[in-house]
UniProtKB/Swiss-Prot annotation:
Gene: rpsB
Superkingdom, taxonomy of origin: Bacteria
Protein name: Small ribosomal subunit protein uS2
PROSITE patterns membership: RIBOSOMAL_S2_1, RIBOSOMAL_S2_2
Taxonomic lineage of the native organism: Bacteria, Pseudomonadati, Spirochaetota, Spirochaetia, Spirochaetales
Pfam families: Ribosomal_S2
Length: 254
């Protein structure tokens, strides 16, 4: 059973939002306070978002569908790949190609082409053609691989999409909403939470925060067949929480 504590969220810097001037007004309901012109997110609502997302993910996996992990920003790319592979889920961590969801059949043809090129390399076909042709095919394979490797085994549309930084991944959101695919996403203070089915208020820039959220989703997938949920440990009262925020805020300013 995954155990999430308020302290672990604080240590990952989950509570730090953006500068006050960058606030999306629709995020006001997730704001706890303001410190040194930085918004502090309400971790109680973060915990609720984690719980809701955990339950949705497990429901999707039990239905036989997959969760597509998406995070193309520098801080998220490697983490998205690692956690998606750990839970044997599809992922996109380089660039979202328009139509990956809304034009899935066309994308599948590109995936089939990539698989064919990989097979040609393995079965000795490359050894039977000219170096010039091999060079051209390798360039084509590299180009396809860069954007499609993570979804090579995604035979059908996912049951849900998990996103890091919805502001950056707006095309993904538009496609998922059009198809009625549930969206789980970490929402920072500059994001619009209203287009997300399961918003998780949190820092989507700090690597430790991104890693924590992505691991939680991966854990939910891996534990879906064990009939276990998530344990939330709220081990800080409001006074302790404010004290921790002050300390963390001072460290951030240094």
């Amino acid at each position: 059973m995954a155990v999430i504590t308020m302290k672990s969220l604080l240590e990952a810097g989950v509570h730090f939002g953006h500068q006050v001037k960058r606030l999306d007004p629709r995020m006001k309901r997730f704001i706890f306070s303001e410190r040194n012109e930085i918004h502090i997110l309400d971790l109680q609502k973060t915990l609720q978002g984690i719980k809701d997302s955990y339950e949705l993910v497990q429901s999707v996996i039990k239905s036989g569908k997959k969760v597509l992990f998406v995070g193309t920003k520098k801080q998220a790319s490697e983490i998205i790949e690692q956690e998606a592979k750990r839970s044997d889920m599809p992922y996109v961590n380089n660039r979202w190609l328009g139509g990956m969801l809304s034009n899935f059949n066309t994308i599948k043809k590109s995936v089939q082409k990539l698989k064919k090129l990989e097979k040609m390399e393995i079965d000795g076909t490359f050894e039977m053609i000219s170096k010039k042709e091999v060079s051209q095919l390798n360039r084509e394979k590299l180009k396809l691989s860069k954007n499609l490797t993570g979804i090579k085994d995604m035979e059908e549309l996912p049951g849900a999409v998990f996103i890091i930084d919805p502001k950056r991944e707006q095309i993904v959101i538009n496609e998922a909403r059009k198809l009625g695919i549930p969206i789980i996403s970490v929402v920072d203070t500059n994001c619009n939470p209203d287009v997300i089915d399961c918003p998780i208020p949190g820092n989507d820039d700090a690597i430790r925060s991104v890693a924590l959220f992505t691991k939680i989703i991966s854990d939910a997938i891996l534990e879906s067949d064990k009939e276990v949920g998530i344990q939330i440990v709220e081990n800080l009262n409001e006074e302790d929480l404010m004290s921790e925020i002050e300390v963390k805020n001072e460290k951030k300013e240094l």
